[in-house]
């Protein structure tokens, strides 16, 4: 399928997919699938609620060779990474969960820097409704 571009107010818009949708596929097969649909970009889940089935941030941050192979897998298909995704709750009233989500967000920021990306998709977080809260206080609806 040929890559197509949509325009909005005269500017070209690239089309992409949240690669987590193909989380049951190996990374390279998921990239091939995205490319076969004529897409230009992928948003990659790097932990927290989206999971990290295609991206081990710890390994990529520690190994320049693994980071290069990861980046090359995307670029060799004519795709680009539009964003890293790490939706979580760094303000969760459970201190262990909040700390884990903050660590994932921090690693996403460090990985984005190494990949030359300027976009990370995340949640700001939602605290509990008081000092003894055990869960976040979602005012309008629960998620996830």
Residues covered by each model-derived region:
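Short, Lys/Arg-enriched N-terminal segments with co-localized hydrophobic residues
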Residues: 4-12
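Transmembrane beta-strand segments of Gram-negative outer membrane beta-barrel proteins
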Residues: 13-15, 79
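A short, Lys/Arg-enriched amphipathic alpha-helix followed by its capping loop at the start of a domain
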Residues: 15, 33-39
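Active-site beta-loop-alpha junctions enriched in small/polar residues
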Residues: 18-22, 45-49, 86-89, 125-127
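Active-site acidic/histidine proton-transfer and metal-coordination neighborhood
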Residues: 28-29, 33, 68-69, 73-80, ...
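Conserved beta-strand positions in the central sheet of alpha/beta enzyme cores
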Residues: 43, 83-85, 121
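Glycine-rich, proline-tolerant flexible connector loops at the mouths of alpha/beta enzymes
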Residues: 45-71, 125-131
């Amino acid at each position: 399928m040929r890559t197509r571009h949509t325009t909005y107010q005269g500017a070209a818009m690239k089309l992409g997919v949240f690669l987590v949708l193909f989380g049951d596929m190996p990374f390279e097969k998921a990239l091939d699938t995205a490319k076969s649909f004529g897409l230009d970009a992928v948003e990659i889940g790097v932990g927290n609620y989206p999971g990290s089935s295609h991206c081990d941030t710890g390994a990529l941050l520690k190994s320049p060779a693994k980071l290069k192979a990861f980046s090359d897998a995307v670029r060799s298909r004519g795709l680009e990474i539009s964003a890293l995704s790490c939706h979580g709750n760094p303000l969760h009233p459970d201190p262990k969960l909040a700390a884990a989500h903050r660590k994932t967000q921090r690693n996403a920021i460090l990985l984005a820097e190494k990949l030359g990306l300027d976009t990370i998709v995340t949640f700001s977080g939602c605290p509990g409704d008081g000092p003894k809260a055990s869960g976040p206080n979602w005012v309008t609806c629960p998620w996830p």
